[in-house]
């Protein structure tokens, strides 16, 4: 099959959308299919093919609510006129989906859409946009959701739409088959007996790093511990991973200047942690290989993100055999049930679906899990076994292939 994937961003850009589409596209290429990705032109992309996947760039941006800009007609003409057997459009609220609304009826190949959560469903500015959504969805041959209950699938169900599948996210069997060879703890000066809490996400303060830090400030363990706060690598804007001579690793100044709102609380938490014996914080911008190694080298993954759909990091934590503790954001509770690799910490959810956890509540859950080594071992083992059995990208890609072929 000749398959076109449409997504706002793609490699070398980082993010969940990019990761999912790259994994699915590359797996399908390995199965003998042809895959092309239509995406935004970005600085630093010096290729038009990556691992067998053709990349077609367009200078377009925005969405129907904020406004579309760029060579929109070029993109529409490409999608309509090229001879693809199937098209997969990832995510609403962005140009690769919104630009095609007027021409969906002209696309004659099999059309598949992944709504991706509808993060702005409850925002007043998007009311008109989502009033039109049911009619737009009905023009697709098939829909793919990541959760059995969430904003996007609930909207589809409420309008009688039944042509869909629930296909979970996953983690790479190539990245997580075995722990990386280099010693992460040794490289960053972390002692073998230290209990390591890990959190990963970008942008930092939307992914709950402040709440995790404030919770860690309150955690009391009988053994030394380390909290690793990792953001995505970005050599143009952030420094490399810091060395480990001090207890507190500071954010690059450029980042701090752009996030003043939570910085006062964040700095206060860091100062308080610094005064406590046996506790350290490591703030990093690790490259991908080191992130994978951190998953294998840590003791508990802690996730306090404010808004998500189906967080990849929870599948990756399970794949590494690393127990996770997450707030009930997106379908985190469903992922915990599917993988049996983690637990959910209670947290409040506002009218727009944003989750906020009380640091003292999160701290107590972190303490409870860190103190129960047998339960941690059980969660880690169950998570890894279930990932191997059901949630590797190879198995997920096979489910996509069946949808693409209409079988």
Where are these regions (language model features)?
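A short, histidine- and acid-enriched strand-loop-helix "catalytic/donor-clamping" loop
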Residues: 65, 92-96, 110-127, 142
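A short helix/loop element that forms part of the nucleotide-sugar donor recognition site in Leloir-type
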Residues: 74, 177-190
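A short, active-site helix/loop in glycosyltransferases that binds the activated sugar's phosphate group
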Residues: 126, 133-176, 181
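Conserved donor-binding/catalytic core segment of Leloir-type glycosyltransferases
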Residues: 142-144, 190-207, 213-220, 230-231
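Nucleotide-activated donor-binding/catalytic signature segment of Leloir-type glycosyltransferases, i.e.
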Residues: 239-289
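Short alpha-helical donor nucleotide-sugar binding micro-motif in glycosyltransferases
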Residues: 293-298
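Aromatic "clamp/platform" in nucleotide-sugar-dependent glycosyltransferases that forms part
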Residues: 306
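Short hydrophobic beta-strand element within catalytic cores of glycosyltransferases
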Residues: 323-326, 333-337, 343
């Amino acid at each position: 099959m000749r398959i076109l994937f449409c997504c706002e961003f793609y490699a070398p850009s980082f993010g969940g959308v990019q990761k999912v589409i790259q994994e699915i596209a590359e797996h399908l290429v390995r199965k003998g299919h042809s895959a092309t990705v239509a995406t935004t032109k970005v600085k630093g992309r010096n290729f038009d093919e990556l691992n067998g996947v053709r990349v077609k760039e367009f200078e377009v941006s925005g969405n129907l609510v904020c406004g579309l800009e760029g060579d929109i007609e070029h993109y529409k003409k490409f999608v309509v006129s090229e001879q693809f057997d199937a098209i997969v459009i990832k995510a609403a609220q962005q140009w690769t989906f919104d630009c095609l609304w007027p021409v969906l009826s002209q696309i004659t190949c099999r059309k598949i859409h992944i709504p991706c959560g509808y993060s702005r469903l409850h925002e007043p500015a998007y009311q008109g946009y989502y009033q039109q959504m049911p009619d737009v969805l009905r023009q697709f041959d098939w829909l793919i959701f990541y959760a059995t209950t969430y904003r996007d699938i609930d909207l589809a169900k409420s309008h009688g739409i039944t042509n869909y599948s629930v296909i979970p996210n996953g983690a790479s069997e190539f990245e997580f088959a075995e722990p990386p060879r280099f010693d992460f703890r040794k490289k960053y000066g972390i002692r073998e007996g230290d209990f390591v809490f890990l959190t990963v996400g970008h942008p930092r303060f939307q992914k709950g790093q402040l709440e995790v830090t404030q919770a860690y400030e309150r955690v009391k363990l009988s053994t030394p511990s380390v909290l690793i706060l990792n953001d995505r690598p970005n050599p143009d804007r952030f420094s490399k991973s810091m060395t480990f001579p001090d207890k507190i690793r500071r954010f690059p100044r450029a980042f701090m200047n752009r996030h003043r709102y939570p910085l006062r609380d964040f700095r206060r938490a860091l100062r308080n942690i610094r005064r406590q014996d046996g506790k350290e914080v490591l703030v990093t911008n690790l490259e991908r290989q080191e992130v994978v190694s951190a998953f294998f080298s840590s003791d508990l993954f802690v996730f306090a993100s404010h808004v998500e759909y189906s967080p990849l990091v929870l599948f990756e934590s399970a794949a590494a055999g690393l127990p996770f503790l997450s707030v009930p954001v997106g379908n985190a509770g469903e992922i915990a049930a599917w993988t049996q690799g983690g637990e959910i910490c209670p947290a409040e959810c506002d009218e727009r679906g944003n989750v906020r956890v009380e640091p003292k509540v999160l701290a107590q859950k972190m303490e409870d899990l860190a103190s129960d080594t047998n339960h941690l071992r059980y969660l880690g083992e169950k998570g890894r076994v279930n990932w191997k059995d059901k949630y590797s990208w190879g198995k997920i890609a096979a489910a996509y292939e069946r949808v693409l072929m209409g079988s």
